[in-house]
Each structure stands twice: as C-alpha cells, then as structure tokens.
Amino acid sequence: VGTPSTNSGTVNSVEGKALEDIRVVSDFPGVFPEDLPGMPPDCDIEISIDLIPGTDPISKRPYRMDVKYLAELKKQIEELLSKGFIRPISSPWGAPTLFIDKKDGSRRLCIDYRSLNEVTIKNKYPLPQIEDFFDQMRGAKVFSKIDLRSGYHQLKIRMEDIPKTAFTSRYGLYEFTVMSFGLTNTPAYFMYLMNKVFMEYFDKFVVVFIDDILVFSRSEEEHEEHLRLVLQKLREHQLYDKFSKCDFWLK
C-alpha cells in the first residue's frame, strides 16, 4: 500500500539503525515486535462476509504446487496455526492456495478467493483519495511513515463468517479466524478501523491509507509531540508495526 511521497530522498531512514536510536520511537518498543504476538484483541469491528442471497458454499480443487514450495507451505501453515490465525476444519467451503513472490525475496501465501468475492456483497466504505493528502500536508516539513505489520491479521472475522474463509491445501482444509489477504472487503474494513482509531488527529497531523500511517508536522518540536500521540494510540489499540518498513523524521 502506498502513501504520498515526501520528496525526502531517503530510501529507508531506519536502515542500519536500532529502534532505541530513534527519538520518541525508542519509548515504544512494544509497538514494533519482530512478529505479531498472537490473536488481535476483541473490538467492536469484525469482518463480515455477507453473501448474495441464495449462494451455495463454494469449493475448488487445490492448485498443483511445485515440490520446491511444499516445505514453505507447510512452514507458513504451521506458523498461522501456532498464532491461532487459522484452524483445521471440515467444511463445504474451500478456496485454493498459491504463493506470490515479495520484493524482499520471501513468498506470501495467498488464498484465491475470487469465487467467494464474486458472491460477496461489496462494502462501500470510502477509501481516501491520494490527491487529498497533499492539501492536508501543505506547509509540513517533518514526516514519519508507519507501516503496520501484517495489518490484515490484526482484525478478527465475525464468528458466523469464519467457515467461508476455508482454504484447501496438500496438508488439509483450514479456515481463518482473522482477516485474510485477498478477501474483497478487507481494505474497507481496515480503513474503517484506522479511521476510528485516528479520527481526532485527521486534518491536523495524520493521514492514513489502509495500513500506512503518515505523520506530518511543521517543526521537529511539533513532530515529537505528534509522533508520540500516534504511537500511544497504536499501543493503546494493540496495533503492531514493522520497524524495517517505517521511515522516521524525514525532512
């Protein structure tokens, strides 16, 4: 997910730095874990998967997977199981799995939910227009960009909709208990969550696009206060971030 450029020329302001070396950020180590600690907390926002009336359960055969990917598939399934993000299931639902290569050379396990998405009633919650961000940031001189860690796994799925997330694999059938990458309405629900968390700071010093948070200020003194307020909100709501993908104190 992208946010507007700050024209800072900085590729990655945290490269080669430790968290404890960065002003303000060093006071919030718990917001930047190496991995998500487990299931997200209960909150009043849960993902619902409302279907077109009359829809029957959809099940697709697993895709064939090259043997060289099987060890990675098993590893990622075991990791998801250990966190409680998925669980074994016997279900009439089932979407196939595949891998997508990421920029850092790792592989993202993806579920092909296209058939489910076709029969899902679309959530029309508005996503912001990138162009609007520039008006809000006019006059700002100091910026920080915060990227949530595995953002989609930080929201739970409504209990009765969990079976619809079932996916098939060589190692069995599983269902997600948290939001899964690839479901049609996930950006809308995540935007709803972020708007609720940061609403009081909008049009002042924060813009949010799905799982990217941009903090902007007119001075370093302001930015110290603004960044601290944002990190306090993240800690309060147990929303975790990926330190290596963040940028702080850009000018």
What are these regions (language model features)?
Residues 4-251:
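Retroelement reverse transcriptase polymerase core
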